[in-house]
UniProtKB/Swiss-Prot annotation:
Positions of the catalytic residues: 54
InterPro entries: Met_Sox_Rdtase_MsrA_dom (IPR002569), Met_Sox_Rdtase_MsrA_sf (IPR036509), MsrA_MetSO_reductase (IPR050162)
Family indicated by similarity: Belongs to the MsrA Met sulfoxide reductase family.
Gene3D superfamilies noted in UniProt: Peptide methionine sulphoxide reductase MsrA (3.30.1060.10)
GO MF terms, alphabetically ordered: L-methionine-(S)-S-oxide reductase activity; peptide-methionine (S)-S-oxide reductase activity
EC identifiers of the protein: 1.8.4.11
UniProt lineage: Bacteria, Pseudomonadati, Pseudomonadota, Gammaproteobacteria, Lysobacterales
One GO CC term, this protein: cytoplasm
Role description: Has an important function as a repair enzyme for proteins that have been inactivated by oxidation. Catalyzes the reversible oxidation-reduction of methionine sulfoxide in proteins to methionine.
GO term, biological process aspect, one: protein modification process
Protein name: Peptide methionine sulfoxide reductase MsrA
Catalyzed chemical reaction(s): L-methionyl-[protein] + [thioredoxin]-disulfide + H2O = L-methionyl-(S)-S-oxide-[protein] + [thioredoxin]-dithiol; [thioredoxin]-disulfide + L-methionine + H2O = L-methionine (S)-S-oxide + [thioredoxin]-dithiol
């Protein structure tokens, strides 16, 4: 039998992932900071999912961006439906901690969101982010359109040049289209740093400026 530690640096294979559940976790559907819904159709708005380490600090990065309509934290990219936080932390779901960003692309460009993403964490660290270790902290961009996917790949290549010049290694960010199912996390984790202003935030960027989104 595999121990939890076996999944700190690799994703579970088919048959190894936890089974999860059919029913979604309970969710209070109002954003604590801006009052907008966390879940809905979001007609006329764009969506993307970002993984950049612990989702508590990652969500705050994006709810502070003008033009972002709402944000929510959850689990994505893995195999276990409607996983719980403890299940994700075991490494046996395959999910990364993710932020759903719903935005008005007339008010904020996708390039600007990509710049926030790249500059807010170290995308070269593989299955960890800072002191947070495990597959659930891996860097990821889950795109909802082909245009987003193409832009994400181009931004990765542009930022890689800057990181290489600064002495960093290869970007390990997982970039996917179409986006996998986003499973909303428990209520306690939504807008966590608004509820707990002095709460833990392990995010730290590289200090290397991303060359995209400057004029977008």
């Amino acid at each position: 039998m595999l121990g939890i530690g076996a999944f700190k640096q690799r994703l579970p294979r088919p048959g190894e992932a936890l089974p999860g559940r059919e029913q979604a976790l309970p969710l209070h559907n109002t954003h604590l900071v801006n009052g907008h819904p966390l879940r809905g159709e979001f007609t006329g708005l764009a969506q993307v999912q970002f993984g950049l380490g612990c989702f508590w600090g990652a969500e705050r990065k994006f709810w502070n961006v003008p033009g972002v309509y709402t944000t929510a934290v959850g689990y994505a990219g893995g195999q276990t439906p409607n996983a719980t936080y403890s299940e994700v932390c075991s490494g046996q779901t395959g999910h990364t901690e993710a932020v759903l960003v719903v935005f008005d692309d007339h008010a904020v460009s996708f390039a600007q969101l990509l710049r926030t993403f790249w500059e807010s964490h170290d995308p070269t660290q593989g299955m960890q982010q800072g002191n947070d270790m495990g597959t659930q902290y891996r860097s990821a961009i889950y795109c909802t359109t082909q245009a987003q996917y193409d832009a994400a790949l181009a931004s990765r290549d542009a930022y890689q040049q800057q990181l290489t010049a600064a002495g960093y290694g290869e970007i390990t960010t997982e970039i996917r289209f179409p986006a996998p199912t986003f499973y909303y996390a428990e209520d306690d984790h939504q807008q966590y740093l608004a509820k707990h202003p002095n709460g833990y935030c392990g995010l730290g960027g590289t200090g290397v400026s991303c060359p995209i989104g400057l004029d977008a």
